[in-house]
């Protein structure tokens, strides 16, 4: 049985590895040090949506975790997408806690994480890496890139 966060949305399958051609190698734990939280600040651009928040301090260069979802072509990519070299990882219908990382635009002057692609056994893995210290309780943010907003 896969252990998922207690407040995980019921309409999204929780996975913490990529789904590729129907095969999954599912680990049975959640990403540590983070919590999904509904944004309750009415002044926030993402009010009423979800965000990912630190439950511990993260230092610059820490790896928060691997972004997971279904491997798809760039052509079929949706809105919850991280890009690799020739493919994308779409977490719209399945993924892990990292799918709730919001863009820093209109929230913070700069993101506190970035996406980095690394290779394990010649397979790409999309990782979220801390770019500046994140304090406990702080929202985890990244830049979706200019093309997302065009």
Identify the function of each model-found stretch:
Residues 4, 8-112:
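Catalytic cores of histone-lysine modification enzymes
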Residues 2-10, 105-150:
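C-terminal SET catalytic tail plus cysteine-rich post-SET Zn-binding segment of SAM-dependent SET-domain
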């Amino acid at each position: 049985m896969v252990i998922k966060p207690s407040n995980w949305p019921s309409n999204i399958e929780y996975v913490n590895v990529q789904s590729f051609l129907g095969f999954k190698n599912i680990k049975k734990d959640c990403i540590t040090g983070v919590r999904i939280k509904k944004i309750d600040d009415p002044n926030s651009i993402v009010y009423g949506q979800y965000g990912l928040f630190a439950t511990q301090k993260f230092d610059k260069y820490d790896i928060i975790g691997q972004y997971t979802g279904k491997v798809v072509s760039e052509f079929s990519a949706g809105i919850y997408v991280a890009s690799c070299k020739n493919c994308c990882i779409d977490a719209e219908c399945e993924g892990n806690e990292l799918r709730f990382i919001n863009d820093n635009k209109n929230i913070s002057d700069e993101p506190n994480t970035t996406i980095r692609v690394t290779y394990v056994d010649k397979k790409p893995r999309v990782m979220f890496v801390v770019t500046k210290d994140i304090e406990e309780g702080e929202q985890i943010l990244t830049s979706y890139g200019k093309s997302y907003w065009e």
